[in-house]
Amino acid sequence: MLSRSSTTTTTPSSVRSKVLAIAASAALLAGASVASSAVAAPAPATVPAAPVALAAPEVPGRGSTALNLFQWTWSSVAAECTSTIGPAGFAYVQVSPPQEHIQGTSWWTSYQPVSYRLESKLGTRAEFKNMVDTCRAAGVGIIADAVINHMTGADAGSGTGTGGSAFGVDYFPGLYDGSSFNDCRSNISNYGDRYQVQNCRLVSLQDLRTGSNAVRDRIAGYLNDLLSLGVAGFRMDASKHIPAADLEAIKSRLTNPNVFWVHEVIGSAGEPIQPSEYLGSGDSHEFQYARNLKGYMDGSIAGIRGITNGLLPSDRAGVFVDNHDTERDGHGTMNYQWGQKYLLGNVFMLAYPYGWPTVYSGYKFTDRDAGVPGSTATRVPDASCSNTAVWTCMQRKPEIKGMVKFRNAVTGTAVTNWWDDGSNHIAFGRGAKGYVTINNSASAVTRTYQTSLPAGEYTDLVSATGARYTVDSSGRFTATVPQYGALALAVGSSTPVDPGEPGTNRTTVFYRTSWSTTNIHYRVGSGAWTTAPGRAMTPACTGYVKLDLDLGSATTATAAFNNGSGTWDNNGSRDYTLTGAVARVDSGQVSATSPCP
């Protein structure tokens, strides 16, 4: 059996087998290396000269914010581009590897190629092309995850891929044979040894001889095929395991040698291979940013301005809160299971001017190797955001959609008017275009904020409730930010963001209260409950607060109310059933009349 060392220093998307080497992972997370077995090495590799800058491409009016739709089928991505991603203002969608791969239900089969045919469990070539065209029509470019370091594992033996292609241990008909792979046939055991990392097998995966012109031509042919279909850029999987010079040589063979690349290079202190040496052919994902972000969100965010210290230059760094590897493999990042703190991490990433951000959206899991529920060996079911038990659909969260709009509105501005309370409440402006405040504490906070915004009335982009705030002639406004909540104002934010998935049924909830802060904790139909304390309600008329609920195709919502500080009204443990166009809750009774003129 093979072991899997899932660590911050070693593991790209492709490293997946059935046994977890827990001890090795712990050692590497601490910065140590697994003991090396002797591997004969040629002369030491040279580090390339100073790289040529290739900044992340900006899409006019959309900036460079990307969305990673992990294990979404091409048909599902196409539909989502039209309904949500394009209207929300995303510039790009990163999709999972499109090439043919080994059969199996686990997600990591997508990272074990057997050919470069576009016939994967996520869809056919025709479906891929339709996705690219549909998303482009919605203003969204496709970034394809390119797996070019290796083919499937030597331990896989022979078999048939998802598109019907036969393959052997080191034979991939019409593509590669034994001469196409590096001479080192053992697994990497020492990440302090550059030769091993870039020439030996990554957990038995057949390591391509990328220094060979024949192999370079084959890889370039695959990428050029994707470019011919309209792909806008590539995430280069496992770049750390390919010499930077080889990648530059491959890119020079492309029909568009200036196409955008972002490298997966998981750097760690003391290792010989670092993200900076790959900047000659593209940007690099900055994994340390995500680790730093988790550290601040798990402790105090007052010092979060220092999150970029020692990291790549902003115009060369791709950033994320998590990705499909780190959410599973203990890389020290947050994931969807962090609830509101995870959303606040995304709010900060989208508000702060460092790097180009990617929002991650995948599916829920308890087994790190498990594929999407309902997957077969050759097909993944289409994504459905109405199935909240499976899909996370972060791109539909009001916090995410609102902050994508915020980021697009404040492009080109620096941080101004920084304020923090020395603990877990921060606020800062983006010049005269925007202002955001984040409360990473368990208590609601009311204060007056100093901004550089022009005087006027602004709609909060985060809460999606339509809450409006007046900035006076001195740039000040007063607001209550709920526990583990945020608020964002931007010039032009005169229309509230649509709260969640579009629907046909809508209920305006009025609640009578004397609380200074009121939240509604609810679920629509038989769906999932909101994360406590729920959504903040806004003043309606004397004695009442209100909130509009989008019920989608459902006709009822179940709810309880709270003040954000532990006091609840759950109707004597029975909760409230809300239905109709208006639901007025007063002293334990629900009626259908509005209390406000």
Predicted regions and their residues:
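Structural beta-strand segments of beta-rich domains
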Residues: 505-509
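Low-complexity, acidic Ser/Thr/Pro-rich repeat tracts that form intrinsically disordered stalk/linker regions
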Residues: 40-59
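Aromatic-rich carbohydrate-binding modules that target alpha-glucans
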Residues: 465-466, 512-554, 563-578
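Aromatic- and acidic-residue-enriched carbohydrate-binding clefts of CAZyme catalytic domains
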Residues: 61-64, 101-133, 166-209
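Extracellular beta-sheet/turn segments enriched in Thr/Pro/Gly and aliphatic residues
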Residues: 576-597
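Active-site-proximal helices and loops of the catalytic beta/alpha 8
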Residues: 54-66, 80-86, 90-91, 97-119, ...
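Secretory targeting and sorting signals
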Residues: 1-44
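Active-site mouth loops of central-metabolism enzymes
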Residues: 66-76, 205-216
